[in-house]
């Protein structure tokens, strides 16, 4: 595919900034944060336009905090100005150019895709393969600390291959480098140490100690809208290699998790070695969880447990997801009954794809 001749001067437009602001507002859960910003809305949006137009925009500091869902994770929240710029970059620079280059089975965070599309593909592939009544194997791979290990320079080189305009590259570089500042790891250390002082189990303390830090010129800020699309794009070369050069028809990737289905276990072993070599070129490596399984013994992907029993496909909710759902519902039942209704509706959509009537009844989800 040819390089994009998208122009920075065309992208930097007040109406695009205004549209991006509206998208940010729509996706902001705590609306009280917007009150002060909205008092001087026109002035704030004009300031963003002027900074971008004069090419002196610089990504600000993150508000860094810890969540547990179910594991401890660091989230890096942007101020409103940076959120609006990131939204504009995502909608008008990244998506129009990157989306057409992605394979159909790269499912995470994309419009009309997500877990539903990944689930449907996995189910479709398994139903097709089981017709031959042969043993089916799955190579299930996981990339080690994916978001934290994405190499900035490798990513920027990839972007230079698809964007001609230097000002666009400079803006993307500015956003990508925003996790390089020394305060980021200091903030994370402070948050972790504060949490460790609480009355926690040994398990949770060990889990906290394993929360990653950012190495210089490595990692994307977790929470940025641009980080999501840059992360699904980073492995695009390998996605095409797996589908086209290795001729893996039954391949699905969901961010840092991937599966390849095949009748031939030895072929999957070879493919695994190729993936390991190709990931090394991207300065990444596979997690220890990566393995090859017989589908009749079952495997878990995107939270579902897929098993072939007597050549019949059985799909259930995975144990980890089941535990997370139970904990969430228990917490919201006590603390936020209004939100509980919305969460249950969301879980119902997720559960109805699997054999989960007993679980739905037990948790009163319908």
Give the ranges of each region predicted by the language model.
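Active-site-proximal segment of RNA-dependent polymerases
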Residues: 3, 7, 92-151
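Glycine-/proline-rich flexible loop or hinge segments
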Residues: 23-35, 65-76, 103-105
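Conserved pre-motif C helix in the palm subdomain of viral-like polymerases
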Residues: 72-103, 214-244
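Non-catalytic, polymerase-adjacent accessory regions of viral genome-replication enzymes
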Residues: 1-46
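Right-hand nucleic-acid polymerase module
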Residues: 78-79, 87, 207-217, 266-270, ...
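Active-site-flanking structural segment that lines cofactor/substrate pockets
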Residues: 43-72
């Amino acid at each position: 595919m040819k390089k994009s001749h998208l122009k920075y001067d065309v992208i930097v437009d007040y109406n695009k900034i205004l549209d991006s602001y509206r998208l940010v507002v729509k996706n902001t859960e705590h609306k009280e944060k917007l009150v002060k910003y909205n008092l001087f809305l026109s002035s704030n949006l004009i300031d963003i336009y002027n900074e971008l137009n004069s090419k002196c925009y610089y990504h600000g500091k993150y508000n860094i905090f810890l969540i547990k869902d179910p594991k401890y994770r660091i989230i890096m929240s942007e101020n409103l100005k940076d959120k609006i710029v990131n939204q504009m970059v995502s909608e008008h620079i990244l998506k129009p150019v990157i989306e057409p280059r992605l394979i159909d089975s790269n499912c995470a965070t994309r419009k009309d895709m997500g877990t539903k599309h990944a689930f449907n593909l996995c189910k479709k592939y398994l139903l097709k393969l089981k017709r031959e009544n042969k043993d089916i194997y799955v190579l299930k791979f996981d990339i080690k600390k994916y978001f934290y290990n994405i190499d900035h320079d490798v990513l920027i080189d990839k972007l230079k291959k698809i964007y001609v305009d230097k000002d666009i590259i400079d803006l993307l570089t500015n956003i990508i480098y925003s996790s390089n500042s020394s305060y980021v790891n200091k903030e994370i250390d402070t948050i972790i140490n504060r949490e460790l002082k609480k009355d926690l189990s040994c398990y949770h303390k060990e889990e906290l100690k394993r929360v990653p830090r950012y190495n210089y010129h490595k990692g994307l800020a977790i929470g940025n809208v641009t980080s999501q699309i840059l992360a699904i794009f980073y492995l695009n070369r390998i996605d095409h290699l797996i589908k086209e050069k290795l001729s893996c028809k039954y391949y699905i990737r969901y961010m840092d998790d991937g599966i390849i289905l095949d009748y031939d276990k030895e072929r999957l072993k070879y493919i695994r070695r190729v993936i390991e070599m190709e990931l090394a070129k991207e300065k990444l490596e596979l997690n220890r969880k990566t393995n090859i399984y017989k589908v009749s013994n079952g495997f878990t992907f995107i939270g579902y447990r897929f098993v072939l029993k007597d050549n019949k496909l059985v799909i259930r909710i995975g144990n980890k997801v089941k535990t997370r759902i139970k904990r969430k519902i228990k917490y919201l039942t006590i603390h936020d009954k209004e939100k509980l209704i919305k969460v249950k509706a969301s879980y119902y959509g997720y559960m109805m794809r699997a054999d989960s009537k007993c679980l739905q009844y037990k948790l009163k989800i319908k």
